[in-house]
């Protein structure tokens, strides 16, 4: 496993994280130094603007009749990513890839191991909002918030992490409102994936998507916050907004949750059709979990979750390279005429005893039998 941290961006912007920065998918430049076995739960943010945390299911960290191999499982994390401007004139996607979070914030926090953090930001109305959140992500999500400190993951810890993530989304949203250099009509969707030990927690506001592959089956770890989502449509209409026939919020946005876009939001504390509160899902990783795919809507506009999982799974079986898998996913979406920027992140979970060899599905293996005559000929050939 290579412990690395990566922030990828397209524009030439000042770097603020102590990590390697990549301009698109080119070579890295150094940044200046600055700062169904287990439980599956979902937390939906309140629509009133207050912070709420739904209770964590008791079986998310079971200790009773659970298979001991599940309790002993520790994922080994590696990842890759790829981004392409697609047919658009400007690149408004940003993403973060940190395989070893402890190496980045270890001086500030005690974290369970392994720990990792990933994010995709899909900007609109310009690239500034997505770039701003990406640049300040460590501060928003870890430094400014009361992120819980412990080396052990428990139900209490999970609740505290969820609250911290929810606050981070709201604080990032407020920071965009206060930054005079960012237009009120500029915004970004945001999806983050945090791994702490066996815990995977995904927070989402917008139409990026995270999909977990469990034994080849796609499990959505986020919901698309689009006007066609009936629950989102109801919330928007109850908040005084409206959805047009062609699927736009207040005739402007194709999403119902986003950071920024303060020209569409009422004053802080008021109920607005467009909100920044994330929807949070969490799951306990097991040996059955192979990888996580995170992508912007440019991927999901033309690919289903299961199609994306199948593409990545085939790639890992061929070459076992998550970066190549991310590129293949983007190229497949482009081949299907995606009309947006495209970003894909592939996070692999691999137990220590699997090695680096790709796992070949049983159905791909072939057995051959020899006739007695052929067997005798082969033995004579081997015996010389």
From Swiss-Prot:
Pfam families: PP2C. Residues 78-349 form the PPM-type phosphatase domain. The keyword Hydrolase applies. This is Probable protein phosphatase 2C 49. Its cofactor is Mg(2+); Mn(2+). SMART domains: PP2C_SIG (SM00331), PP2Cc (SM00332). Signal peptide: none annotated. GO terms for biological process: response to salt stress. Keywords: Hydrolase, Magnesium, Manganese, Metal-binding, Protein phosphatase. Belongs to the PP2C family. The lineage of its organism: Eukaryota, Viridiplantae, Streptophyta, Embryophyta, Tracheophyta. Mn(2+) 2 binds at residues 122, 297, 340. It is an enzyme of class 3 (hydrolase). Its EC number is 3.1.3.16. GO terms for molecular function: metal ion binding; protein serine/threonine phosphatase activity.
């Amino acid at each position: 496993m290579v412990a690395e941290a990566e922030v990828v961006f397209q524009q030439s912007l000042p770097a603020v994280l102590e990590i390697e920065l990549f301009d698109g998918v080119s070579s890295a430049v150094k940044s200046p130094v600055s700062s169904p076995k287990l439980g599956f739960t979902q937390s939906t943010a309140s629509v009133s603007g207050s912070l709420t945390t739904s209770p964590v299911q008791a079986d998310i960290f079971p200790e009773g009749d659970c298979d001991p191999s599940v309790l002993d499982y520790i994922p080994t994390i590696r990842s890759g990513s790829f981004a392409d401007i697609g047919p658009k004139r400007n690149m408004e996607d940003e993403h973060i890839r940190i395989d070893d979070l402890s190496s980045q914030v270890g001086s500030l926090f005690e974290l369970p191991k392994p720990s990792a953090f990933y994010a995709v930001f899909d900007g609109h109305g310009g690239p500034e909002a997505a770039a701003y959140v990406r640049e300040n992500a460590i501060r928003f999500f870890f430094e400014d918030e009361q992120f819980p400190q412990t080396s052990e993951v428990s139900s209490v810890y999970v609740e505290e992490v969820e609250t911290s993530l929810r606050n981070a989304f709201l604080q990032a949203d407020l920071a965009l409102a206060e930054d005079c250099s960012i237009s009120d009509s500029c915004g970004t969707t945001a999806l983050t994936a945090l791994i702490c030990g066996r815990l995977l927690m995904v927070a989402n506001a917008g139409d990026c998507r995270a999909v977990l592959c469990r034994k080849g089956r796609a499990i959505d770890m986020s919901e698309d916050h689009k006007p066609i989502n009936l629950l989102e449509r109801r919330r928007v209409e109850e908040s005084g907004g409206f959805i047009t026939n062609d699927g736009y919020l207040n005739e402007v946005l194709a999403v119902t949750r986003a950071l920024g876009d303060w020209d569409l939001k009422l004053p802080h504390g008021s109920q607005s059709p467009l909100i920044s509160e994330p929807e949070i899902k969490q799951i306990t990783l097991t040996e059955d979990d192979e990888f996580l795919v995170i992508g912007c809507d440019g991927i999901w506009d033309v690919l289903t979750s299961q199609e994306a999982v199948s593409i990545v799974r085939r790639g890992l079986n061929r070459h076992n390279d998550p970066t190549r898998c991310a590129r293949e996913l983007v190229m497949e979406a482009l081949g299907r005429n995606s009309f947006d920027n495209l970003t894909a992140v592939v996070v692999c979970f691999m137990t220590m005893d699997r090695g680096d060899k790709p796992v070949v599905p049983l159905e791909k293996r072939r057995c051959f039998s020899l006739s007695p005559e052929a067997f005798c000929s082969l033995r004579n050939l081997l015996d010389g």
